[in-house]
């Protein structure tokens, strides 16, 4: 741990998170707010903390995050991906447990585009025979 801070970029759906890890007491700041203030849902908070709990680093780093785009779920996933990438910068040996849990792989599922002649991506307009 020679560097003062470790950086990771995470993406999920249309959200992009930039994450900085700094050795500290475990304070997580998202867009200048605490984690509890930023995310109302408990599931989003749990998703953000998953890589830290898995690697037993929950109280060891102060985490500063800037996240933009998407909704709560996408932003939480982007932060999780960013924290994972930053943890890999801290210690490359953490790659095996994080990869096994599926945190290293970027979730590439994004919104399907709307097609012309259709109501949405797949739903057609109501069809009438007569």
Swiss-Prot record:
UniProt keywords, alphabetically: Ribonucleoprotein, Ribosomal protein
Q: Name one GO biological process term.
A: translation
Which species does the entry assign this protein to?
Geotalea daltonii (strain DSM 22248 / JCM 15807 / FRC-32) (Geobacter daltonii)
Q: Which gene produces this protein?
A: rpsI
Query: Key word Ribonucleoprotein present in the record?
Result: yes
The keyword Ribosomal protein is assigned to this record: yes
Q: Which family, according to UniProt?
A: Belongs to the universal ribosomal protein uS9 family.
Molecular function, one GO term: RNA binding
> What does UniProt give as GO cellular component?
cytosolic small ribosomal subunit
The identity of this protein, by name, is Small ribosomal subunit protein uS9
| InterPro entries for this protein | Ribosomal_Su5_D2-typ_SF, Ribosomal_uS9, Ribosomal_uS9_bac/plastid, Ribosomal_uS9_CS, Ribsml_uS5_D2-typ_fold_subgr
